[in-house]
């Protein structure tokens, strides 16, 4: 029996573990799924993970759960059965099991808090018997034709590896300076109801991570909040049917040119704020936007001075701005895991990529199964698969399709997922 190791025990890991468990119950041979996690299942949706205080609302519909969109194409003539079995671990099934389904309906099907979403994921993980090895991965190495995940206490060997999560939220431009908060430090203060009181506050970043922090900052005693991002303005994420369908059904995504895909991602996913956050921004005259990239930060005379670089035509302009408090919400490094690779593993990866490791090279090399092409043993990177495979895979928008793609590559060519399933539809 082969083994699939997953770095992180979040929503993607739970979705893959659930699908593997159901397939195993159906008599289909699938790899053993082992998640290696430093804190706990769904930790990034709790205050302990550093990315939230747990009290804010989920930005994605909770019905987009671990099985969504319930359109499996893994087991010929049994895909409807697979979908039906997966509904046992749906959001609705969790609410029924916890005697809260009727209340959720009567309240208008509200988005759950991050904490409640983490409880749902933990419920699924418990019910499918998900294997979790607790420990922080210190190195990702290759031994023969297998991966080796080294923690301080143990080593997990696997035939394939999937890396998930945004990394750690502790990074900061000025570590140790009390006027410069990392994402984790900000949410720790919010979770402990430690009110921020400052005249001029800056938030670095124009994506959903920064948007969530702005949503929290509204409640604190600050005179002005400046959002710093390289975009021309604070764009609103497209949230209509046509935009959402790109996330749920990526069938037509490969037919788009790279330029068209990048344009779609820019409008719907990267560096954009949700419409609900934008509505709050409109109502608060403390919010301002400053265009530029932060190139330098220094603490001077009780302030943080940020140097911003802005391209204006052919000219690169640098300006300096002072703030009483700065929150680095620029988001996670897409290559946060790169320092974990052993030299041999890095050489193997760069050989497959045909050049030095970079985010752009990796994104363009992700195949249909969400793994890096021409690299053995397999390395699944769903968080970098948006450009080539569709915008829903890096987030929560199509966890059921994600598990199909990953597990489908382990079932052999006869069971490899079809581009679209025409013969079966499983109603919910």
From Swiss-Prot:
Its cofactor is FAD. Residues 1-20 form the signal peptide. SUPFAM superfamilies: FAD/NAD(P)-binding domain (SSF51905). Pathway: Siderophore biosynthesis; mycobactin biosynthesis. It is an enzyme of class 1 (oxidoreductase). GO terms for biological process: biosynthetic process; intracellular iron ion homeostasis. Keywords: FAD, Flavoprotein, Monooxygenase, NADP, Oxidoreductase, Signal. GO terms for molecular function: L-lysine 6-monooxygenase (NADPH) activity. Its EC number is 1.14.13.59. It catalyses: L-lysine + NADPH + O2 = N(6)-hydroxy-L-lysine + NADP(+) + H2O. Flavoprotein monooxygenase required for N-hydroxylation of the two acylated lysine residues during mycobactin assembly, thus producing the hydroxamate groups necessary for iron sequestration. Is also able, but less efficiently, to hydroxylate L-lysine (non acylated) in vitro. Belongs to the lysine N(6)-hydroxylase/L-ornithine N(5)-oxygenase family. This is L-lysine N6-monooxygenase MbtG. It comes from Mycolicibacterium paratuberculosis (strain ATCC BAA-968 / K-10).
